[in-house]
Amino acid sequence: MENPYEITAIVAREILDSRGNPTVEVDVHTPIAMGRAAVPSGASTGTHEAVELRDGGKRYHGKGVRRAVENVNKIIAPELIGMDVRWQREIDKLLIELDGTENKSNLGANAILAVSLAVAKAAANSLELPLYQYLGGVNAYVLPVPLSNVINGGVHAGNELDFQEFMIMPIGASSFREAIRWVSETYHVLKRVIMGKYGKNAVNVGDEGGFAPPMKEVTEPLDALIKAIEEAGYKPGDEIALAIDAASSEFFKDGKYIVGGKEYTREELLDLYKELVSTYPIVSIEDPFHEEDWEGFVMITNELGKKIQIVGDDLFVTNPRRLKKGIELGAANALLLKVNQIGTLTEAMDAAYTAFRAGYSVIVSHRSGETEDTTIADLAVALNAGQIKTGAPARSDRNAKYNQLIRIEEELEGIAVYAGKNFRKVFF
């Protein structure tokens, strides 16, 4: 008798991401269903991330992924065909073994992850379950607070802002649908605020849909956000809070942090963060120090960790080993979860549970180069993470995730809980 959950075919192809760069998409087939997944790509990447395989050469300026696609079609597919699509952990283990390197540089993390995610989707579709329920079970019911990146700086934009992201968090909303409305309304008011001060050319958007105005001082975007929140009719802090991704590895040079043209020591930069947190309703700071500045992370966690969320992105790169080191040291109190930093769904979920067990919060995150794939929306609900970071409410690659969360909330009507002000500890 035919096993309806047996993998019968795996097909990979090269498609384009939101920046017009190639990425990998994979279809996994069973006799009764198909799962499709496409992988994202980051601009500010941590040194310890799993490695994307790119072709080099002239084609696509060296960014083609035909080698990764070939690795799926010729190496991975023959090994997985015949396996039960529901064996996610076994399949991911096999993918890691087939690659044989610690950073997945042989087959490519982009090839491996596309297969891993497509397997999960094929299993969910074969079982006629929504992906969030397949991954999280009947207890997956918490809708996340969006950390919406509405002003872009750093490597995501062409302005002089050193900090990479300035985000709004609708913590006072009563549902995800209300939260995303608050974000959208504030975003449109922000456009007006920026145009009024910097002119109509200042509302071009960055990779993640946020505006990239000609700002330089770190306080300029924060002041603009407060003004936009108030003019949209909301209360800064109580209803809509602020969050920052400093991405400080990008402005760390020769042992110093360069912000706004000024040099800062670790201690001076910590003082700047403390001043910002005391002045503005900031509830989360991501990558406040360089990815190897463990001491800086410990310092800021000791100083501000009881009051706000200190997030490790480049610090942890969704890597369980680096996360465990951070937990032992007391560095940061939150994990930014990016599935493509580690390369398989199993490893990403393991990292999330490691964080939860240590009392760390988890933010499921997109990358700056995205696709229309909505897996991370389902993953945020599956984990009851309470937070998702997936850009401004603009550009279809970002809104695809928000729209999926709206659908999930609708499916869970009567059961769904919006994390709101409990975004850091949804069950406490």
From Swiss-Prot:
Cofactor(s) annotated in UniProt: Mg(2+)
* Annotated metabolic or biological route of this protein: Carbohydrate degradation; glycolysis; pyruvate from D-glyceraldehyde 3-phosphate: step 4/5
What is any one of the record's Gene Ontology cellular component terms? extracellular region
Where does the record place the catalytic residues?
A: 208, 338
Binding positions ((2R)-2-phosphoglycerate): 164, 338, 367-368, 389
Q: Where in the cell is it found?
A: Cytoplasm; Secreted; Cell surface
Q: Which family does it belong to?
A: Belongs to the enolase family.
What's the stated role of this polypeptide? Catalyzes the reversible conversion of 2-phosphoglycerate (2-PG) into phosphoenolpyruvate (PEP). It is essential for the degradation of carbohydrates via glycolysis.
- State the protein's name: Enolase
Give the gene symbol.
Answer: eno
